[in-house]
Design a protein with these regions (language model features):
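Extracytoplasmic/peripheral linker and loop segments enriched in polar/acidic and small residues
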Residues: 300, 344-346, 397-408, 436-506, ...
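Surface-exposed binding/hinge segments that line
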Residues: 90, 124-171, 175-196
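Long beta-strand-rich cores associated with HINT superfamily self-processing modules
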Residues: 504-526
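Structural transition elements
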Residues: 188, 321-359, 373-380
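N-terminal lobe/hinge region of extracytoplasmic solute-binding protein
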Residues: 32-82, 113, 183, 494
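Ligand/substrate-recognition segments at binding pockets and active sites
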Residues: 197-199, 237-238, 256, 346, ...
Length: 526
């Protein structure tokens, strides 16, 4: 459907229609969430809905503030000894899980171990750890094979997969298996009995939570749950969601369609802006285990034809204030962004790309593209790629589904004939791709890597050198080399940056600018 036709249809939906939900009750934040909460394990998956859920339910030892400084969170503090080879962490007093049990050092060690098996930064940390020891219930020590000054950054990061602390018995679950208990120590308790996958989810304030006695800053500081309840309603249809916000039936919406933002801004009862720091990046991910995209020349052919502006206009409209081209594997406008090796994305040459497809020996193998229709940005990018692949001569099987199903299917390492996949789109926020440590998508460590499983020993060696570097100038040089190598093998294709608007009632106060949506610090005025 064209934008003009869609907006004409939307005008009808803003007329009186049956109410979707009752007006927000006092003490309850009613949220329209654009994507299904399909998994409750933030280590097993990195989908945004699970990440948003996890920041309410779980807590971190350390966290990152608005100035990108790592600060204590669950930790009271830490000491560094033995020439940087031993870190001793002390937990704050009074920490407890939602089942009433105290948070202990054993829980922290088990949680670090499980997280480090899946996360890219965590895997590097794990390779440097010589051992982890319980000192007592509130203190534990991490012993390193050699100094690793980035250890606090790994434990406190907000990006990709976070090191959330779980009870020891839960963290003992294989990192390749989803957990069956969902008990954290964060400011909100998840109400499992009220969870209806695909429809709704709810949380209640955890009265046993002891926040830090300091102002919130980014995701650091005092995580004060000011609302008694948070309720998500999953509304994938943007016209329905917009009409509900216009009528004041919900308090917050996290995925406003760009075309609808001007109309919502005309409503004197709404605020429309993005609280997400640095915006969001679109990406095209390949399955590199199976044909046809185990052939790097075919990946390069697609990159040669890509025009980021086509993708960003599809997502964010024609106003360049909403989006930007970013031909970097690291977030543009940050220290590690560069132009190294990115000439292939400046080609934008469909005829050259067609010739490359032919020269690469493509034989008409079926390409299964999975597309999440309940995420407006992912849906928009998916249509652009579908058209591009067809123009390049690929035999495309376009599978439209929801993000939760996509997240389940992308786990499969089977060929397409057995339910596997070939390509999909995903989105990551600015802090998720700041540098080689946190950019999960650039990892090229094969079977132990993120979905798509690219393998590139050269890139991995360069990444290891980046971690070992001690000077900023050396790290910048190595980051540029990593990017140049990534453009040769293409673990993914960067598709640009956009600023996703959110909308909330003017009665809602305390919305924090952060790397990810957060629900603590938010209150509602009468």
């Amino acid at each position: 459907m064209r934008r003009r036709e869609f907006l004409a249809g939307l005008a009808a939906t803003t007329l009186p229609m049956p109410a979707i939900a009752s007006r927000s009750a006092a003490g309850t934040l009613k949220v329209i969430h654009g994507a299904n909460l399909s998994s409750l394990d933030p280590i097993w998956t990195t989908v945004p809905a699970t990440k948003d859920y996890a920041f309410m339910v779980y807590d971190q030892l350390l966290s990152i503030d608005a100035s990108y400084v790592i600060r204590p969170q669950m930790a009271e503090g830490w000491t560094v000894e033995n020439n940087g080879r031993a870190y001793t962490f002390t937990l704050r007093e009074g920490l407890k899980f939602h089942d009433g049990e105290p948070v202990r050092s054993q829980d922290c060690i088990a949680s670090i171990r499980r997280w480090a098996a899946r996360d890219g930064f965590g895997q590097v940390l794990a390779s440097r750890i010589d051992g982890m020891d319980v000192v007592d219930d509130r203190r534990f020590r991490i012993r390193l094979k050699k100094a690793f000054p980035l250890l606090p950054a790994a434990l406190g990061k907000s990006s990709s997969s976070q090191c959330f602390i779980m009870p020891e018995r839960v963290a003992a679950t294989s990192p390749m298996t989803q957990i069956s208990e969902h008990i954290g120590s964060g400011p909100f308790r998840f109400l499992r009995d009220e969870w209806v996958p695909g429809a709704s989810a709810a949380w209640a304030r955890f009265d046993g939570y002891v926040p830090r006695q300091e102002p919130v800053s980014g995701i650091a500081g005092g995580r004060v749950a000011k609302m008694a309840r948070v309720e998500w309603t999953i509304i994938g249809d943007v016209a329905t969601a917009s009409a509900a916000m216009m009528r004041g039936e919900y308090d917050y919406w996290d995925q406003v369609l760009f075309d609808l933002a001007p109309m919502l801004r005309q409503n004197r009862n709404l605020v429309v802006r993005s609280p997400i720091v640095g915006g969001t990046y679109g990406m095209l991910r390949f399955n590199q285990l199976h044909p046809p995209f185990n052939n790097p020349e075919l990946r390069r052919a697609i990159a040669t034809a890509v025009d980021q502006a086509d993708y960003m206009r599809a997502v964010a409209g024609d106003d360049p204030a909403n989006w930007a081209v970013c031909n970097s594997f690291f977030a543009c406008g940050t220290p590690y962004a560069s132009e190294a090796g990115n000439g292939i994305l400046r080609e934008k040459n469909i005829d050259k790309a067609k010739a490359m497809v032919k020269a690469a020996g493509y034989k008409g193998e079926r390409v299964v593209q999975i597309a999440a229709t309940d995420s407006a940005p992912v849906d928009a990018m998916s249509h652009v790629t579908h058209d591009l692949l067809q123009r390049l001569g690929f035999n495309v099987d376009y599978v439209a589904t929801d993000f939760g199903t996509l997240a389940q299917r992308r786990v499969s390492r089977e060929p397409v004939e057995k339910g596997g996949w070939s390509v999909f789109h995903t989105i990551w926020n600015n802090p998720d791709i700041l540098d080689p440590a946190v950019n999960q998508m650039i990892r090229s460590n094969g079977a132990t890597g993120w979905f798509g499983w690219p393998a590139d020993d050269t890139l991995e060696t360069l990444r290891g050198e980046w971690f070992d570097a001690t000077e900023d100038a050396e790290r910048k040089r190595l980051a540029a080399e990593i990017q140049a190598q990534a453009y040769k093998t293409l673990p993914y294709i960067p598709l640009g940056n956009y600023t996703q608007p959110h909308a909330w009632s003017k009665k809602v106060v305390g919305v924090v600018s952060a790397p990810t949506p957060i629900y603590w610090n938010i209150a509602k005025e009468a």
